[in-house]
Amino acid sequence: MSEIRTGFLTMATIILICIGLTMTGTGLYYRKTVSKCIRETDGSFVVIGLLLLVIPQFALYAICCHSKRMFTIYIYAMIFVSIVLGGYSLKCFIYNTTFGIAKNPAEEKRTAKQLVGRLVPESKLAKVTECIIHNHDCNFNASQNSNVWRYCCAQPRGCGVTTMFGQPGEWSWKHQHVENHVPEECSYEYCLSCRGCQMSILKAIVHQWKYLSMFSYPALFLVCLSLAISRSIMDTFDEPDDYRGYYS
């Protein structure tokens, strides 16, 4: 019976390590590909990933050494991991259930003022829109064709013959922002304060937490399962530190 529990703990540990490796890689990938203006969960991915990559390995050492002391260290460390994961999972759940933004943000009936609050404060929304202008994100990220750049960087209606891009798909706000050759009806505030833009920013933030939940939920379940199994295995040890190097 002990061998079966040990086998389940080993499998759960290996899966957790794989999840940790994937999350760490995802966080580092986010830092290189996602604009810092809307980058929200890259640090969370790296932190959780490193915890899952390192701490579950103690279970393998404890199993190999048949050490009660190592299991004790592992259990306390995993309790800390479960608290961290529980906090992130709760935040993901709140984001996912609070913000149900339409697939096409421009068709969302609610206004940004109805959605901003403690989760996404109004100052955060203002900071993102300011960042888009001053970092010239329309030049850098428009090719990704995400909703944020589609609705925040697209030329507003009513601009007449004045264009904000040199050729289709190539934005030139950087040049016009520097020389200030944009007429009043085509000002940056017109586009950045529109419903589609603001909803796209909120949706981009929420989507990152939703993606994080795809990892945090199963990881939290496996951590709790590993804790239960390791606690039952440790109860079978008679000595505080029973190092044998094999199973008996």
Swiss-Prot record:
The gene is TET16. Belongs to the tetraspanin (TM4SF) family. Keywords: Glycoprotein, Membrane, Transmembrane, Transmembrane helix. Residues 29-44, 91-208 are extracellular. Residues 1-7, 66-69, 230-248 are cytoplasmic. It is a multi-pass membrane protein. Glycans are attached at N96, N141. InterPro entries: TET_plant, Tetraspanin/Peripherin. One of its GO terms (cellular component) is membrane. This is Tetraspanin-16. Pfam families: Tetraspanin (PF00335). One of its GO terms (biological process) is auxin-activated signaling pathway. The chain crosses the membrane at residues 8-28, 45-65, 70-90, 209-229. The lineage of its organism: Eukaryota, Viridiplantae, Streptophyta, Embryophyta, Tracheophyta. May be involved in the regulation of cell differentiation. The keyword Transmembrane helix applies. It is found in: Membrane.
